[in-house]
Amino acid sequence: MLGRILNFIKKPTSKNIVINTIGNYLNVIFIAFFAFLLVRIMQPSEYGVLSVLLGISYVLANILDFGTTASIYSYLPVMIEKKHKNIYIFLKTIFSYQTGFSVIIITLLLIFFPYLDKIFFKTDAPSWELYVTTFSVLFFVWQNYAINALNAAKQFFKANLYLNLSNLIKTVIIIGLIPFKAVNVGTIIFTFGILGPLVFFLLLFFEKKHIFLKIIKAPVVKSEFRLGYTLTFFIASQFFNLALRMDLFLLSYFLSRSPEIGYYGLSQKIILTVMASIGSITQVLSPNFSNIKTREEVKHQFKIGFYYLLIPTGLFFLLFLTPNWVFYLFFTEKFAPTAAITKALSLAFLIYPVLNLPLLYILYTAKKPIHILTSNLIIFLTVAIGCYFTIPKSGVFGPPYVLALSFFLGGVVLLIASIYEYKKIPATAI
């Protein structure tokens, strides 16, 4: 038994997952420390505003991915393996289209954000904080693009090294702001959303200067964007990203400026932190799924993926079992309600990790993102409609039940679609 475990750990996939997981959890530690620090400086209502604005920034950065993540993981690993001459053309094209579309959306947001905040988000944040939030979106988009490219090239160590060095510098900056009493919503968003990504890119540029120059010189070729595949996954991923934030946005709508938004925002951040472990695993598994050719390979990758994804499933369960005093220790009793909210959310997310297996298969093996679009649309509608009716009655404890139901319904769709597509795969290599 011990020998099998050691052999499992020694596999290249396991090593990459260990590297990526350690890196992601260093990032998690920084995020936890930021929360640990900020809840001691900011009032719950102020932290609630920060949670909403950062949530908007993160959601928009994911929206403005435009499905390029799927293209990068589907095609870049094969291009690198075969030393394809279009590697830099591919990277330049993806970056150019993504940036161009992002600038259009960000410009519209700059114009309408104050109005949207007034009628929907109701944070009452000053205009300059809204504008800093808007500009931070583009920097997050560029950082995500670079991280995806590094991961697709299996440069997991470097991606995590640069990200966590930028986290270290952000920590120093925030601590430096404390004596000047300059820690507020605006300065935190500026530090997280603009300075952090800038540091990341500077570190990457110094080490990969030759690649930067080749990408700059490469032409933009429209066919490399793969619009049909990319656009479908883009729409699908946006429904899911919005679903994960819709609970907080609707809480902000119904419970404007209430401390409960701060409690829930902190709980959501804890859950999203655990979800980082899922990303660290799927980022490594994705290239493997893109190379599947037979049913035996499907079974093999599902088996491997299932073992790895039991880790975040176990983390959600451990989070549910965590004593309340642990939450009080890290976040103070000022945020005491966070403990119960986090436990409720952890149960809701318990089945989510394993749902990534059929998702990876459909996206990278079958290359049929339309099924993911259907699943994510159901998840989004369930969360949006469910939270709209449960929040006025149950407050912050309404969304966890709705999220659990949404994952179940979305999972059923993914499972049925996977079985349907599996039947099309040849049993053995031809």
Summary of predicted features, one role per range:
Residues S14, F113-T133, S258, L321-I351:
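Interfacial segments at transmembrane-helix termini and the short loops linking adjacent helices
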